């Protein structure tokens, strides 16, 4: 009869160096795409030529850059601030999300003003409807994050459960923002400037950071939180 040792946990298999570098490379690429795509939309919009021209600029800053970077802050492999403490990264996360909300509000204001000046109807496309829902969900996420920042003042009793909700809903909000961006590429404004193969390339660019963020949250954080609860 073989003796069995109780309480021992087998050591996890060491990750191959190539796999580790590929994971890091995917994170770097996500940062570059988030920044590059934002710059691309800014140049394409030619800000200042009209009220509408500011709408894609601020929305790209809000969701393609600020929100993406605020989420990637917590990645152990993809964060640009991996050397900072968790407390510092939480503050940076709040700064990034605050910037995202401010830019989103400005983008919303410009599109409303443009519609009013042009005497055009509001909320007549899937892009506008999903975008409006994304803005509402972003506001809800901000309130949830505020409760986590000050749990005693908000009288939160189950912080771990609220963190899980915040993580899950945050991923949903970012995916909603990605869908809104993709729907914007079907607009007359975008298709009049970008056509053919370039249009399909642009359609795929926002999906890459979304996949990286989805993998980050689902594989490295959510399982642990479920165990804690």
UniProtKB/Swiss-Prot annotation:
Major subcellular site: membrane
Top-rank taxon: Eukaryota
Membrane spanning stretches: 25-45, 54-74, 92-112, 129-149, 170-190, 194-214
Annotated localization: Membrane
Membrane topology designation: Multi-pass membrane protein
Catalytic activity of the protein: monodehydro-L-ascorbate radical(out) + L-ascorbate(in) = monodehydro-L-ascorbate radical(in) + L-ascorbate(out); Fe(3+)(out) + L-ascorbate(in) = monodehydro-L-ascorbate radical(in) + Fe(2+)(out) + H(+)
Residues of the Cytochrome b561 domain: 22-224
Protein residues bound to heme b 1: 55, 127
Listed EC numbers: 7.2.1.3
Ligand binding (heme b 2): 93, 166
Single GO MF annotation: transmembrane ascorbate ferrireductase activity
Cofactor names: heme b
Textual note on the cofactor: Binds 2 heme b groups non-covalently.
Regions of this protein lying in the Cytoplasmic compartment: 1-24, 75-91, 150-169, 215-229
Cellular component per GO, a single term: membrane
Lumenal side: 46-53, 113-128, 191-193
PROSITE patterns: CYTOCHROME_B561
Keyword entries, A-Z: Electron transport, Heme, Iron, Membrane, Metal-binding, Translocase, Transmembrane, Transmembrane helix, Transport
Pfam families: Cytochrom_B561
Function: Probable transmembrane reductase that may use ascorbate as an electron donor and transfer electrons across membranes to reduce monodehydro-L-ascorbate radical and iron cations Fe(3+) in another cellular compartment.
Protein name: Probable transmembrane reductase CYB561D1
Organism per entry: Mus musculus
Gene name of the encoded protein: Cyb561d1
């Amino acid at each position: 009869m073989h003796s069995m040792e109780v309480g021992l946990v087998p050591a996890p298999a060491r990750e191959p160096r190539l796999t580790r570098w590929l994971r890091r490379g995917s994170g770097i690429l996500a940062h570059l795409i988030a920044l590059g795509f934002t710059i691309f939309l800014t140049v394409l919009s030619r800000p200042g030529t009209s009220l509408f021209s500011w709408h894609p600029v601020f929305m790209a800053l809000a969701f393609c850059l600020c929100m993406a970077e605020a989420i990637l802050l917590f990645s152990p492999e993809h964060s640009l601030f991996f050397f900072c403490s968790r407390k510092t990264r939480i503050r940076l996360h709040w700064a990034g999300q605050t910037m995202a909300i401010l830019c989103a509000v400005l983008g919303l204001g410009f599109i409303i003003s443009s519609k009013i000046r042009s005497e055009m109807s509001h909320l007549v496309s899937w892009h506008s409807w999903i975008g409006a829902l994304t803005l509402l969900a972003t506001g809800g996420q901000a309130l949830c994050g505020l409760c986590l920042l000050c749990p005693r003042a908000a009288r939160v009793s189950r912080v771990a459960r609220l963190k899980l909700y915040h993580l899950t809903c945050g991923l949903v909000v970012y995916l909603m923002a990605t869908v809104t961006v993709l729907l914007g590429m079907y607009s007359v404004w975008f298709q009049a400037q970008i056509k053919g193969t370039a249009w399909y390339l642009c359609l795929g660019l926002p999906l890459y950071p979304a996949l990286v963020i989805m993998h980050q949250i689902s594989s490295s954080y959510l399982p642990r939180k479920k165990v804690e609860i």
